[in-house]
Amino acid sequence: MAHNNLQTIAEREASILAPYAMHSSDTLGRCYDEQQQSYRGPFQRDRDRIVHSAAYRRLSGKMQVFTGDMGDYHRTRLTHTHEVSSIARTLARALRLNEDLVEALALFHDIGHPPFGHAGEDALAKCLETEGGFSHNQYALTIAEQLETRHQHFPGLNLTQEVLAGQATRVDKSAPEISPLLEVQAVEAADSMTYDAHDTDDALKLGLVKFAELEQLDLIKICQQQIASRVDELGEREYQRAIIHTLLDCQVTNVLEHTSTALANFQWDSASAARQSDFRIGTVGEIAKAKKQLEAFLYERVYRHVAIVKTRELAQRQIQQLFAVLVKNPEIMPIRFVEHGEQVGLPRSVGHYIAGMTDRFFEQQFLAHVSR
């Protein structure tokens, strides 16, 4: 039965996917051998394992950029992840890539983020600077390979080599000998487009920037031109919503037009052949230039906003304080992290414990063990 179903999956993918896509039948498999299932392919299983993991559920309690003190409209790591998955699957379907693999990669890409976003990551990197530092991308691999437990005979989620390798490209940003799979590139492009749009949206809603400031940016002007060509008149709220929607749409359109043309010219006959090229899925031309301008604006006017900086500095101080307490008093941690410390060293285990916390649970632990 399992063999027949996998044959069906292979036949379906052969009819739908492009030759340059990663076909499920070509997977390098998992670290630990498992019996194949009759109703799911390997990347479908990866997706489901990620979604059902504790680390994935905790993303709902981790801030993206803005904290819960600023309201409850803005994105969390989980909503960001869902938005990335949505855009990445759109790219995959249009480009005839493996949508199951793309979805698994997208749902997995931010699973290693600690509490309080990049402020938390910077704080843990400081705490662990003599131990090799801290990277949320590397921690995602630690979660998948060590910390999550789903089987009595082996550690981790036992994801496919393709998902693990895709995440590994986020750890080491240096130019690889061979390019990442096109599915990995699609997720990277979707991630970038998504946070540009939703950070702009959240910053507007929270009053950190004014719409008049955004109107000075080239990418917003392009969006305005596109809206004017198809809509006569909109109210203020509807117009701003249309801008955010078009901000995504114009980037997705740019990526698909450029990539579709390039893929037709390359005529790769396999995923391996595509990896021999230095081609990258992403925005190009006027849109790419305008995108960089928007990102520079967000960096200066939003990410370095006094309210955001104040929150970052507080979070970093508190994480460093709790880290110091836990290193001196490891018995505070759950026993499995004490045992984990015997394998990776106590400081690293403390870092892993804190990195797995939601914002709220961190605050509870801080109040209980530091601010008492």
Predicted regions and their residues:
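Histidine-centered, transition-metal-coordinating active-site segments
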Residues: 1-81, 85-91, 98-99, 134-372
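Aspartate-rich (DDxxD/NDxxD/DxxxD) Mg2+/diphosphate-binding motifs
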Residues: 102-129, 137
